[in-house]
Curated annotation (Swiss-Prot):
Protein name: Insulin-like growth factor-binding protein 2
Domains as described in the record: The C-terminus is required for IGF-binding and growth inhibition.
Positions of short motif Cell attachment site: 281-283
A Pfam entry, by short name: IGFBP
Length: 305
């Protein structure tokens, strides 16, 4: 069994960590061998040296950056937000979509998940039967072995692993399509029983529209080879939207090949890059450039008047 991620053992552990796409929330049951569909490249000494010093703030636990990053960050604790772009949950926790989420996968992509204690004793079928909103389960991030689950909703004990990445992605695509079908049925039901109370859905923001396009592309993605779905997912830019549907100031590519992704600053309404802001592998401090842009725009408006 591997020791916990953190402390002096961290550089020795990173080269052996794997990024897995599994069925089941939090790993496989007894006697079931997990199928490796995508393996993160090893963290070379050069990549580790580029990380710099560990976080200044005291951390209860250090974990790897999201994706295939090699640098260490503070783990999120129970009750804190989690998702694709947000640091991983602590070792004993898992990232789940909030109860009642209409699109659990989308909630996790946008960082609207919550770190919770691992849910035990629930099979994927039981989750689907008890609540359609949870049919996609949670994005599980195991910070000892790097496991990520984008499909399962509970324990996978007794469940046979899929034998090909194509089958894995087919199940994934079907679950995404099922969400859209369920939403359509709900809208028809409301229109028949409560025509007076039915309100038109709010207009989708540019960030939400871009995210919809990415999710649609994922739902129709095909595997031309045996590299696995995660490698194709890393080639996509998933927009980072806030809870109001606006672009977050900082947008980043996912970490890959042991190197953190590039980050840049955008206008929260349009998603267009802020002029003068850098594109770096780190924090470009977007709030400074956005505030400067706002002040410049306000001064220009006053001069025109």
């Amino acid at each position: 069994m591997l020791p916990r991620l953190g402390g002096p053992a961290l550089p020795l552990l990173l080269p052996s960590l794997l990024l897995l796409l599994l069925l089941g929330a939090g790993g496989c049951g007894p006697g079931v061998r997990a199928e490796v569909l995508f393996r993160c490249p090893p963290c070379t000494p050069e990549r580790l040296a580029a990380c710099g010093p560990p976080p200044d703030a005291p951390c209860a636990e250090l974990v790897r950056e999201p994706g295939c990053g090699c640098c260490s960050v503070c783990a999120r604790q129970e009750g804190e937000a989690c998702g694709v772009y947000i640091p991983r949950c602590a070792q004993t926790l898992r990232c789940y979509p909030n109860p009642g989420s209409e699109l659990p996968l989308k909630a996790l992509v946008t960082g609207a998940g919550t770190c919770e204690k691992r849910r035990v004793g629930t099979t994927p079928q039981q989750v689907a039967d008890s609540d359609d909103d949870h049919s996609e389960g949670g994005l599980v991030e195991n910070h000892v072995d790097g496991t990520m689950n984008m499909l399962g909703g509970g324990s996978s004990a007794g469940r046979k692993p899929l034998k090909s990445g194509m089958k894995e992605l087919a199940v994934f695509r079907e679950k995404v399509n099922e969400q859209h079908r369920q939403m359509g049925k709900g809208a028809k039901h409301l229109s028949l029983e409560e025509p007076k109370k039915l309100r038109p859905p709010p207009a989708r923001t540019p960030c939400q529209q871009e995210l919809d396009q990415v999710l649609e592309r994922i739902s129709t993605m095909r595997l031309p080879d045996d590299r696995g779905p995660l490698e194709h997912l890393y080639s996509l830019h998933i927009p980072n939207c806030d809870k109001h549907g606006r672009y977050n100031l900082k947008q980043c590519k996912m970490s890959l090949n042991g190197q953190r992704g590039e980050c840049w600053c955008v206008n929260p309404n349009t998603g267009k890059p802020i002029q003068g802001a850098p594109t770096i592998r780190g924090d470009p401090e977007c709030h400074l450039f956005y505030n400067e842009q706002q002040e410049t725009g306000g001064a220009h408006a006053q001069s025109v008047q």
